[in-house]
């Protein structure tokens, strides 16, 4: 189940990015809810919030190391992990893999989901992989805080 969820996240992420490239690239943002939600094509050559721009090699090495470490941990401890820990790892691996594929293929990550928050603050544009990574991080932090996640190696 964990592997299937990981693959589903990667497929959904990559298909949504292909659609963004086809229908949003070189076009005005597609407004869904005025002054709140739009689809806007962005080529992100950095990390979250645009930090570390043009550090492709760095991101490839770090992402690959994280994917290897987390995957090995998951395989080694699969039988003792609870379902929420497995969910967190599936989301993390799926999201990281989706953005990793972009960095290898294009040299940047395709982002396209855009929200304007209070006082028209433009929240950084993101994608499905980013959502999976953020949700996994929140879930894993929650599990660690409430002692539902055992770290063993």
Positions of PLM-derived features:
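Alpha-helical transmembrane bundles and membrane-interface segments of multipass inner-membrane proteins
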Residues: 1-153
